[in-house]
């Protein structure tokens, strides 16, 4: 249970603090060479585990304890020597870290080192990471109004907005659309120790889990790996569309779309590194029973009639199939169902589905389709005209 875990974790942190105090007492009466073992283990534990091989992506550093480590070093007789040794230890350890842990490790180390010269290698790398993240953003955009209601689905566009320079340096971002079963793709994605699956599969899992907390995730449709980035009307910036998520709020209390995250792979002076990019939280209104109609263009409606009528109690079957760029609305919003000499005894809605997603100079669209099967029976006064 979380309560038990927190209790044991705090006890462990207190144990590290006491060990650091005992070490400080020892060094005050000896002239031993500075050792940062206790501080390094304490620091590692703040990242999630004293053995860094057990640290997971989901764990967040305990910033308050990182400051305590710095304070414990500063009260030592040879605080300068210990800060220098700690910085050297951070530099050496960072060469052996997994790509996903390295950025968190180095950022956390600067809370302890601050502006000390021994932290210069870490500062240079963190500055490099910040520069990269200034040039690429993960974006989530609602397809239509943010008044989503709670009875009908709506769509969410997922994409990367980035500078032309970083797109060129990274070799494009379409490689993040490579799935584990993809074949014939021109893109290569690097495999890292501890990486579980292909980038698209990783993103799909994250979207399903994160959005699934408050929404019914009806489908996630990805763009093709051959997609090209598109201009967005901002000089020097482009967009690579990734996916379209079909969602429905679970109830009227839903008030936001949560922060979503995606890992991007780059290289620094030590090797590969994974940097997370996140979307901004978006406020939505799920209270209305009926939300505004979603954008729709290029609507096509096809009718297929099975006119075979072989028995007095049998009816005709009329199939209506609608497609369009956007979300196809319910049948009563599309047509007026007034068929002379027939009554509709049954309407079978096959449901809304996303056939594909398209991207072009004018925008990004989800092409949806919806099929209804109507059972028609002649009215009593239809007479011999049938």
Predicted regions and their residues:
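Surface-exposed interaction/ligand-binding surfaces
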Residues: 2-386
């Amino acid at each position: 249970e979380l309560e038990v875990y927190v209790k044991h974790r705090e006890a462990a942190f207190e144990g590290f603090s006491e060990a650091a105090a005992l070490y400080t007492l020892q060094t005050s009466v000896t002239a031993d060479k500075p050792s940062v073992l206790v501080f390094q283990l304490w620091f590692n534990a703040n990242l999630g585990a004293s053995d860094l091989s057990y640290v997971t992506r989901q764990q967040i550093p305990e910033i308050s304890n990182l400051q305590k480590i710095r304070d414990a070093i500063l009260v030592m007789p040879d605080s300068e020597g210990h800060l220098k040794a700690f910085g050297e230890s951070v530099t050496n350890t960072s060469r052996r870290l997994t790509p996903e842990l390295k950025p968190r490790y180095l950022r956390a180390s600067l809370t302890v080192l601050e502006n000390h010269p021994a932290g210069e290698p870490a500062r240079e790398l963190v500055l490099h990471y910040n520069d990269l993240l200034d040039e690429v953003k993960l974006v989530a955009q609602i397809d239509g109004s943010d008044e989503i209601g709670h009875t009908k689905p709506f769509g969410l566009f997922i994409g990367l907005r980035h500078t032309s320079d970083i797109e060129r340096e990274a070799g494009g971002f379409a490689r993040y659309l490579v799935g584990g079963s993809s074949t014939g793709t021109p893109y290569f994605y690097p495999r890292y120790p501890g990486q579980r699956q292909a980038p698209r599969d990783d993103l799909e899992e994250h979207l399903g889990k994160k959005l699934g907390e408050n929404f019914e995730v009806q489908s996630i449709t990805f763009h093709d790996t051959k997609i090209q980035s598109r201009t967005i009307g901002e000089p020097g910036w482009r967009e690579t569309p990734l996916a379209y998520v079909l969602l429905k709020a679970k109830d009227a209390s839903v008030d936001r779309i949560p922060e979503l995250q995606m890992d991007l792979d780059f290289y620094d002076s030590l090797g590969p590194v994974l940097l997370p990019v996140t979307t901004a939280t978006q406020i939505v209104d799920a209270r209305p029973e009926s939300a505004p109609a979603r954008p729709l263009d290029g609507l096509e409606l096809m009718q297929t009639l099975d006119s075979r009528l072989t028995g007095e109690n049998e009816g005709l079957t009329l199939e209506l199939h609608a497609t369009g760029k956007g979300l196809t609305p319910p049948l009563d919003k599309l047509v007026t169902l007034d068929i002379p000499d027939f009554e509709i005894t049954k309407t079978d809605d096959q449901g809304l589905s996303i056939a594909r997603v398209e991207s072009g100079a004018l925008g990004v669209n989800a092409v949806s389709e919806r099929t209804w099967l109507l059972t028609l029976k002649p009215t009593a006064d239809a007479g011999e005209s049938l």
